[in-house]
Amino acid sequence: MSELYSLRGAGMRYNGTEVLHPATLDFSEAQMVALIGPNGAGKSTLLGIMAGLRPGYLGRCAYGGKEVSRWPRRAFAREVSFVPQSVRVEFPFTAEQVVMMGRTPYCDGLFESAEDRSAVERAMALTDTIEFRDRDFRSLSGGEKQRTILASVLAQSPRVLLLDEPTTFLDLQHQVSIYRLLRDQARQGLLVVAVTHDLNLAAAYSDRVLVLRAGEVVRDAAALEVLNPETIRAVFGVDAEVRHTQAGKPWILYGD
């Protein structure tokens, strides 16, 4: 597998407080990685550094052998797509127009190409958004908006997907379908890195799990190694029972 990201002592300090301790990590293509940990653990900060959205970070964060901060924005956008926790659209764009915005890094003129339209059609089919393609984005439910934004970044045809809680607002059916889609994208060669609070989704679909606590990466391994009662208690402060599915994946139970 080809290495895409190389982080060496990458961290972040705000107003004298170290919100992400220096971390040394490598990320390769064809991988689905989950970032888990309590609120304020540094997950979104790490993702933001990788997305080129945290200027002034400590250490090094290189993508494709070049420091993220030195990439031209348009060229970087063709390589790396980022999905934030929420997106605001103030103007009356349809869902399809929002998805077409994902093609912006490729547009050289005023009109979209046949390739642009094909990429949008495919992305909307994958995310089950075709049925409301003509609706005003602002009128969509939270889950519909989230799927539309995901379609937009898939239309971008990147090598890397960085997602900050991609299943926020989604019902159970679409949570599972989106994670299956992300896993399939990883199997097709993409690097997918997703922040999640759902440990069972992380366990079921991720190749690798990074655990963050108080700004520090404390575990980095396969879900089977990471998601155990001891780690869950130490990081999240809750007692849990971990069973295993027929496929050997951890399944976490809470409560008595």
What are these regions (language model features)?
Residues 161-165:
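Catalytic Walker B motif of ABC-type/P-loop ATPase nucleotide-binding domains
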Residues 136-140:
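Conserved ABC ATPase signature
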Residues 51:
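Helix-to-loop junction immediately C-terminal to a conserved catalytic motif
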